[in-house]
Amino acid sequence: SMGELWGRGNDSRLFEAHSRNVTNFLQDELRSAVLPPSAKVGDTPISAQEIKINNANPETLLTFLLPEGSRLLSWPGAPLPEVVCSLQARDGEGLILLWHSRLETKFNEDPPRETVISPYVAGLEYDYYDANLSTWSTEPALKKSTDGATTLTPQRLRLKFKYATYDYDGVVALPTSMQGLPRY
């Protein structure tokens, strides 16, 4: 039938569209995290930080601040600004956005809330640029400095999407703070 002819390859097209849209969404959210006035020139508004997840040992995750929150966040009450967000890929669960507002009374005690951005993200990888060697390296985890004291912020984030037999790699360039007028 005509429906079968036109429907061939639907899964792959829908999966690819979903993967591209999640990648673009994440790029936009990270871009809003580096806009003035919340991000100042020379600051690192996107950085690796230790996050306490559900009373477990803290994990070092890529973390950023969304001054106005995000449309994906489902608040128990009125939405709050200054939302600290972290990204984590979990086996069988996908890409998780961990978030809570700095204005919450138990910000330091309570673990962050969780929202699934995409169930099809099978992993995160981090791209680092070595200016001395003029080369890129892709790491499966956030990289430590040579002395091991700090965790380095990558220049790019790779999203590894997987659905059935389909694979897609989304690349998000991590923006840096820029000088300019605040967004009104």
Regions picked out by a protein language model, each given a short descriptive name:
Residues I46-T60, A89-D91, K143-Q155:
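Short, surface-exposed loop and linker segments with low hydrophobicity and enrichment for Pro/Ser/Thr
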Residues L14, L30-L61:
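Short, glycine/small-hydrophobic-rich surface segments
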